[in-house]
Amino acid sequence: MRFEYPGDPHFAPLAGRADAPNNWGAFGAHDPSLIFAEGAYYAFSTGTFGENYYQIRRSHDLIHWEYAGQAFPAGIAASLAPVLRAVERVYGKGTENDTLWAPDIVPAQGGGYWLYGCYTAAFGKNYSAIFLANAQNIEGPYIYADTLVLTGGDWGLQPNAIDAQIFYDGEGRMFMTYGSFYGGIRILELDPRTGRRKDGLTYRDFAARKVGREAYFGRHVLRSSNAEGSVVAYKRGVPVYRGDIFARAEDARLWSQTDRYYLMCSADSLSQDYNMRVWSSEFPDRGYTAPPYGFAGQKAAGSFSWRRGAEDPRIGFDFFVPGHNDLFTAPNGVEVAAYHCRTPYSDRREPRAHYLFVSLCAYNSKGELLLSPNRYAGERLRKIEREELSGKTFDYVQIGSGNFDCAYAKSGICLEGNGSLMLCGEKMGEWKLYGDNFVAFTFDGMRYFGAAMPAWIEAEARGGITISARGEDGLPFFLNRAF
């Protein structure tokens, strides 16, 4: 039987010069937000390297990117004067920042586009504002429309008005999550007709004590001191298996479907120990948890590499401190996560250049959101046959609870035809393939639930299979095999 795997995507080299934006491609993108508009994919991202006013990149395949300019080329003072004045008032002096951070771009009702942006007075402080701008064309020009949230001081009691992300619930209600670090992640309901706050409240109402903190800033969806870059995605009909696949054979009667909201955030320092975490809930604005860590979330990814060590020449990059991702569904139904990633890994905690990475998304049989541990190369989820896995040897990456070290790949896991999982000839557990592409296995006493999917295996420069799994300890386990 012939199986379909992605061909060579001809990724552009991970290199770039800060002073040559026309040649950047994926280089320099930070905190990306994706949209499909006017026949192409667009990524809006934080300002960097002098292109400070929201960078825009264009792609026709989610693989190759070209720089398309800035959302506010005239700058903050000229384009966003009301935002600048509002932040200066709460800061009590002139601001110390000339960069726009972490945008989100969505279609506007009735046509055009809504750009949700943020501006902060100084790095490391919460004197910030989230604003709305609009444009008729995806590449702009964008025009200021309103300020939705203004914060400043009492960080912890107040949130930080940055990192806005928009989503819609199953009934079409519009929400915005935002916040970072000590103030936690908050949520506000917006009016889908206008893109503005549904309650119409302003900072003046809060400053005059007409309303309290929760009314103005929104309720907490996550109380955290180290999370930022929230994104929520609503998914219908996620398959969930209610049986114990290790104890007995798959029973079709034990499958069901569920509707869930998935919250992703990134935690810790963006240049040293950044890592991507995930929660889920039955409700859009509350109840997000992730066993076994609850409000701490399950780890979707931390720093890892398909190199087998720092000197391995087979692949020239690592997935170093990946984070601040968007969750995006393409017009053809393919679900991906877009995030920034630094490379290569440095044990000296040196800042590294950041790039736009995209990875395929999947779900395990517990309904948990997973990421392919490979860059997207045009693949789609499909049914995986047993002969694609049985008797095959895989490289693997086991990510631990620590976040400062890079988890390098190791070789030697074999999924035997008799259901045994072997490591270098020693039995370490068992494995199961069930449903269309679900894989469960045990390794050294821990149970893992994952999904198998096609992938471009960059370390081997060939197409193949990847398995992304999460253990009952909430930690990821990845396997790659090229054909």
Placement of each model-derived feature along the sequence:
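Carbohydrate-active catalytic/glycan-binding domains of CAZyme proteins
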Residues: 1-483
